[in-house]
Amino acid sequence: MHILVIDDDPLAGEMTAALLESQGHNTLLAHDAMDAVEQLDTHSDIVLIVSDMHMPLVSGTELLAMLREQGNHLPFILLTGDTPSETLQQTPGLTACLCKDAELADTLAAAVKQALDG
């Protein structure tokens, strides 16, 4: 089982993946939405998606909408550098929306546990 981490910033993506790996999860990295779709097509053992919000060409919410339209209903956690608005947190199909802050290790661990146990 893998968690797909999507972030256009390679360092941020690697840090998120390392955080998840330190919690016992296997990860795959994608650097944009198209790479993510390729990873999803290639790896049938992906159980959760963790995506950055702000990416060039296709944002995290646009990727979520695109995947839902294609019938992909994997849990989807969105990460943002901004404080998530209530509207963003209520995006249809979104499992969780978390702020990339000092609490991320704890909030991400809790959101992943809830998504996978859910």
Question: Which residues are covered by each model-predicted region?
Answer:
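Active-site residues of response regulator receiver
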Residues: 52
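Receiver (REC) domain switch/output surface
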Residues: 107-118
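Receiver (REC) domain active-site loop signature in two-component systems and cognate sites
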Residues: 55
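Short amphipathic alpha-helix used as the core "switch/output" element in two-component signaling
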Residues: 38, 61-73
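Charged docking surfaces used in two-component/phosphorelay signaling
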Residues: 14-22
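Short acidic/polar segment at the start of the alpha1 helix of CheY-like receiver
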Residues: 9-13
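Helix N-cap/capping motif at the beta->alpha junctions
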Residues: 29-38, 60
